[in-house]
Amino acid sequence: MQQNQSLEITKVALDAMGGDYAPAEPVKGAVDAVNARSDIKVLLIGQEDVVRKELEKYTYPAEQIEVIHAEEVIETAEPPVNAIRKKKQSSIVVGMNMVKQKEADAFVSAGSSGAILVGGQVIVGRIKGIERPPLAPLIPTEKGVSLLIDCGANVDARASHLVQFAKMGSIYMENVLGIKNPRVAILNIGAEEEKGNALVKETFPLLKECTDINFVGSIEAREIPHGEADVIVCEAFVGNVILKLYEGLAGTLVGAIKKGMMSTLRSKIGAALALPALKSTLKAFDATQYGGAPLLGLNGLVVKTHGSAKAVEITNSIFQCVTFKEQDINGKIRKNIISSTEQEGM
């Protein structure tokens, strides 16, 4: 078991009822996390009898997992605002309130995206000065990973929102991923400054003026897989389309490679020889190893995983929360916003 010398415990509230494979995969993800690290306590939120039945399958340090009863579940098809307002005993609302009341350092869920986005703003609340909280997943590239921000939270963003996304994304990549002076680019249809729609044209000069980020200009969609930027800024509609295309294409390519390798006896022999290198390459492009997408700019950490998240993504999302807390990402975002506000007032 990995030991933390300071033994400062990170408490992660985990939605045991959210996602396509709940409660089995969230529970297994929690167990794997606490079996790997002693500096984590997972608060499993859900229908207690169901959660405990899953826990009975595993051996784990009992003091590191606590079951919090939540009778209700918010389904994906439910209108998010109504669900958050009416289902006070749902796993999502209970988890969000634990973060708000400082009973947990973070909340992780594979549940309803809409409910998580609404709950994050309504219950946890925004850091003072943050106009909109963006959803920011990591996507694999040939050079490592890039942060795609925003990917689903703000489909009607303004230029000032995108500037804040760039700053928050830069802080996240530098402190969580350890990338010094991360390259920030705005997603565009060409490299020239005059290219793009009205939002991009308005945002570009504002980003150029920012002295606290390393703005490198525009990035085209075809350049994303090559890792030409560490932080890719866009509004949520475009970001979500890029993310879903990225994920779908990755799955298609893996399937095509497997099919081709098994098509003939010669290809099967070649596949056996190439298998170690192929596994290593495919692992590098497996987004689940990086955890979920944080909703940045809130008064507490909220992480949204894929609805289809298996245990490994849940576990890595929990580890992600530990790093977020240790690096005081919210404190750094708050400090940056205060500094920016003071400069604007000069």
Where do the language-model regions lie?
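N-terminal phosphate-binding or glycine-rich loops at protein starts, especially the Walker A/P-loop
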Residues: 2-52
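Short glycine/serine/threonine-rich phosphate/pyrophosphate-binding segments
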Residues: 22-26, 89-102, 106-120, 127, ...
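Glycine-rich phosphate/diphosphate-binding loop of Rossmann-like nucleotide-binding domains
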Residues: 24-25, 37, 41-43, 48-52, ...
